[in-house]
Amino acid sequence: MHFGALGDIHGDFASARRTLERHPEVPFWICVGDVADDQGRYEPLPAPLYWIKGNNENFDSIAAAELPDSLHYLPNGAAADIDGIRVAGLGGTFAPTLYDTPAADLPHPRKATAKATVLADRRRHFVRQEVEACKALNDVDVFLTHEAPRPYFAGDGPRRNDAGKAPVNEVLAALKPRLHLFGHHHRFTEQERQGVRSIGLDLVSRSYLLIDGRTLEYEQKIPTP
């Protein structure tokens, strides 16, 4: 059995749908976040998709569980057993000023416009409480994050900054999953962090993975037009 992995979707459900329809033999797919479109909408897909939050989601829809039946949201710090594969995740981005805030208290005030409300919604972040919950999990096969671990250098210039986040490394060191997948940066990368294979996924329109359910060896695939 193989399962699939998608990078950030950003509302490109047409590309996601084509990929899933190309592989009717794949029983389920996982995704590293940023699923919603610019209007906060989610569309059904032809196979189950298990996903963590990115920083671009409709957090009201997630909180109310108002999602298509094929989209299965994985909350931070919890594990799900999917066809014999144990998957857990730490979705969202890192904000140092909010890191010690309880997850339930992350602010999401209503503003005068819809755009301002979205920008003010801090539920896009993960917090220490959720990192500790992830570190306490056991026997995780695949760990999903939206952020990259350190070091992660985006771009090619000489003054590149490390865009990785240390809490991700902390979880990898404690959890030791068999495979780590992340998104956010829209680039396919392969590295090892804390003794764990750590793979950055590209946008759904540019590539995806098929993963062997026994060995967790993967193959990068390029979508067909």
How would you label these PLM feature ranges?
Residues 1-45, 58, 138-139:
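N-terminal active-site segment of His-dependent metallophosphoesterases
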Residues 10, 14, 137-176:
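Active-site-proximal segments of metal-dependent phosphoesterases and phosphodiesterases across multiple
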Residues 17-23, 80-83, 131-137, 215:
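Short amphipathic alpha-helix with an adjacent loop that forms part of the alpha/beta core around
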Residues 5-7, 29-34, 49-56, 73-75, ...:
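Active-site neighborhood of phospho(di)ester-bond hydrolases with catalytic His/Asp-centered motifs
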Residues 80-83, 169-175, 186-225:
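Binuclear metal-dependent phosphoesterase catalytic core
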Residues 10-16, 35-41, 55-62, 78-81, ...:
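Active-site environment of divalent metal-dependent phosphoester hydrolases
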Residues 36-84, 96, 101-117, 121-122, ...:
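Ligand-binding grooves and catalytic loops that recognize ribose/phosphate and carbohydrate rings
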Residues 85-158:
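Active-site-proximal loop/helix segment associated with metal-binding centers of metalloenzymes
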